[in-house]
């Protein structure tokens, strides 16, 4: 039941956010989306087809016949299982829907709350609000939450300032008896109660209070824990909840290292200092004993007291400390309210008794005065009554005489009335006979009108059938006209598409023709290169033949006497120079044979005195015959 009330508070905000006109009604399409999101976030299995059936546009579904609240109870809240979903995700869904419409943070960035802080304060408001709609938080709970946030920041506010602030808010909320959530968030955003506090400090304090009240974190902090296998000490971040003691690798709580379940049979004991550790204590469960060490004696005392409180809650069968405290505060407020109401009722009763006493005294004085006036009036009335009696007696005597005369005239008039009555009876008899004849004529006329009405109804039905057939013919004609127009449009689109494809085909043909021309030019270039290559090969062969002829040794001739005049121009080094030039030519010829480039052809032409044939390549035999190096 408590979980259902908490879920209903968040769903109420989502529903009112969808109710734009403030009429208490929301469209079925929006309710269908809301229900689907609730099914998803609450991990309730559902059939999408059945969901569509429930929110049909007709008036046969359960939502149309019963309203959304019975549907919400029957199909959603009755199927919720505690622990099967993450309540924070559910609250985030409802906050997202209501914050888009109702929550407006300062666009200049002067607000004290971030969106996450506003969401957590919204959750805290729902937790501490009354179980009445629209949801409000009474000033006592506002004071309690403010003190919690300020104590988390290690700040203290004077009692006078707090009472002044709450008095201002009470004046704002005096019509409703408390603050709405948007007034509550505006109180934090304005910074009136948080002068000199930074946004980061406030965010950390709100997060700590959120963990304590919503997530039931009784205490958290670093402790040294002794392992069970290696028996070494490691520092861990511990979080104490009513049902367990969890420990993590760091305070971000991303890596859970273990969990210590707590029940009514667990206990906590203080241990003496040993192994270099001080302020030690242990938690004994049914299966294992966990040894821990705090930083100082105060921390150890706080941890042991908090763990004992969690064990006490388990023994009493309670799941949340702050839910129990909230219920106790509510009962105390109700007792104070009853005492105050009883006191006010007693004061009101005493005031009414005093007023009643004063009123009776005034009535007594009035009665005495009225009695004196009544005596005086009674005397006057007695004298007036006597005179009136005399006058009345005289008047009665005169009336008696007039009555005797009237009786005589009345008898004569009665005789005339009897004669008139006899005539009236005869007239009534005639009228009854006439009425009977008129009724018979009326029945005949009614029958004729009924026959006429049946004929008219038949004619109307025939006219309606003819109009229906005419409408069908007109609809058929309109469909044929639309079909003709659509066919004409499709024909025009097809013609445009064919024209576009024709243009694309022409462009493709032009590109193909250009490619063919480029290919033809490339083929011509290849053929020219091949001709040049063949010509170069022929020239190389021709040059090799000439070089082979030049390489034959010159046979010695007949010896002749040498004169100084005959060999005056002979210089032996020139022959060696010629041989080296010949080797160089053969080497250039071999390079030209490997790579017939235009530059090598030009070099060979320059060496051969303008001959177009390239230098022949040297053969392996020639390299073996003349291995002398170049100069």
Swiss-Prot record:
GO molecular function: guanyl-nucleotide exchange factor activity
Main location: cytoplasm
PROSITE patterns per the UniProt record, alphabetical: PH_DOMAIN
Tissue expression: Broadly expressed in the immune system. Highly expressed in T cells.
Modified positions (Phosphotyrosine) in chain numbering: 210
InterPro entries named in the record: EF-hand-dom_pair (IPR011992), PH-like_dom_sf (IPR011993), PH_domain (IPR001849)
Polar residues bias spans: 535-547, 588-607
Chain intervals with Basic and acidic residues compositional bias: 331-341, 513-523, 621-631
UniProtKB keywords: Acetylation, Cell membrane, Cell projection, Cytoplasm, Cytoskeleton, Disease variant, Membrane, Nucleus, Phosphoprotein
Domain of life: Eukaryota
SMART domains associated with the record: PH (SM00233)
Domain notes: The PH domain is essential for phosphatidylinositol 3,4,5-trisphosphate binding.
Function: Phosphatidylinositol 3,4,5-trisphosphate-dependent guanine nucleotide exchange factor (GEF) which plays a role in the activation of Rho GTPases RAC1, RhoA and CDC42. Can regulate cell morphology in cooperation with activated RAC1. Involved in immune homeostasis by ensuring proper trafficking and availability of T-cell regulator CTLA-4 at T-cell surface. Plays a role in Th2 (T helper cells) development and/or activation, perhaps by interfering with ZAP70 signaling.
Assembly and binders: Interacts with ZAP70. Interacts with IRF4, activated RAC1 and F-actin. Both the phosphorylated and non-phosphorylated forms bind phosphatidylinositol 3,4,5-trisphosphate (PtdInsP3). Interacts with RAB11A.
PANTHER family: DIFFERENTIALLY EXPRESSED IN FDCP 6 HOMOLOG, SWAP-70 RECOMBINASE
Name this polypeptide is given: Differentially expressed in FDCP 6 homolog
Source organism of the structure: Homo sapiens (Human)
Lineage per the UniProt record: Eukaryota, Metazoa, Chordata, Craniata, Vertebrata
